[in-house]
Amino acid sequence: MSDLHNESIFITGGGSGLGLALVERFIEEGAQVATLELSAAKVASLRQRFGEHILAVEGNVTCYADYQRAVNQILTRSGKLDCFIGNAGIWDHNASLVNTPAETLETGFHELFNVNVLGYLLGAKACAPALIASEGSMIFTLSNAAWYPGGGGPLYTASKHAATGLIRQLAYELAPKVRVNGVGPCGMASDLRGPQALGQSETSIMQSLTPEKIAAILPLQFFPQPADFTGPYVMLASRRNNRALSGVMINADAGLAIRGIRHVAAGLDL
């Protein structure tokens, strides 16, 4: 039996991409899974697909009242909350400083930071009392843009660097009761969209990047699927497998940090 059996896990943005892969994985691990999802259609799809195994709540991660409503339903259903996974986010499709109009830059900043940073902060606030009571954990989705330039434009990159600071501060404030960590995946097959302020709300990441382009820059030379990144979340959520890690950011970058100067990877001819 998995050590996550009957653990209560709350994931934001569980309707598609990495969020959906996390929902699938934690249900497989025997956890009681809940998600806060903006799209009514995705909420309906989750309920139809997973039935009683999912508590799918329609709501916006930029609204504290929606978080409170979700947490109340989780506590009514499970009687506890063991792990909060802040995952919902948006990308800026590499919108650059020079090519983005000033007024768009300002409105895009507020929209993107509201989702990627404030959304995490509000989720942490709403979940903290229950997680302190259960001595549970928080996990936040980062990105390779939390370590490197070029994983997005200045808006997205700044938001993910801000999230690393949030993780460290919350890990400090909530210790010893709550472990707070992050996972930073690289590019993957997902439906990640952009800010409406930048005209990107209907544009997914795969319309800007191709599988071949993503695989070519990674030393491990493959095109990741969302399920490829769920393992670190499972490990960090596990009380047995993660007793000692807090304030840690796992850089799940398929080897980006070891790219060579002469070649992407030295073993391409092996």
Swiss-Prot record:
Converts 3-phenylpropionate-dihydrodiol (PP-dihydrodiol) and cinnamic acid-dihydrodiol (CI-dihydrodiol) into 3-(2,3-dihydroxylphenyl)propanoic acid (DHPP) and 2,3-dihydroxicinnamic acid (DHCI), respectively. The active site is at Y156 (proton acceptor). Keywords: Aromatic hydrocarbons catabolism, NAD, Oxidoreductase. Its EC number is 1.3.1.87. This is 3-phenylpropionate-dihydrodiol/cinnamic acid-dihydrodiol dehydrogenase. GO terms for biological process: 3-phenylpropionate catabolic process. NAD(+) binds at residues 10-34. It is an enzyme of class 1 (oxidoreductase). NCBIfam families: 3PPDhyd_Dh_HcaB, PRK06200.1. The gene is hcaB. InterPro entries: BphB-like_SDR, Dihydrodiol_DH_HcaB, NAD(P)-bd_dom_sf, Sc_DH/Rdtase_CS, SDR_fam. Belongs to the short-chain dehydrogenases/reductases (SDR) family. Substrate binds at S143. It comes from the Bacteria. It catalyses: 3-(cis-5,6-dihydroxycyclohexa-1,3-dien-1-yl)propanoate + NAD(+) = 3-(2,3-dihydroxyphenyl)propanoate + NADH + H(+); (2E)-3-(cis-5,6-dihydroxycyclohexa-1,3-dien-1-yl)prop-2-enoate + NAD(+) = (2E)-3-(2,3-dihydroxyphenyl)prop-2-enoate + NADH + H(+). The lineage of its organism: Bacteria, Pseudomonadati, Pseudomonadota, Gammaproteobacteria, Enterobacterales. Pfam families: adh_short. Pathway: Aromatic compound metabolism; 3-phenylpropanoate degradation. One of its GO terms (molecular function) is 2,3-dihydroxy-2,3-dihydro-phenylpropionate dehydrogenase activity. SUPFAM superfamilies: NAD(P)-binding Rossmann-fold domains.
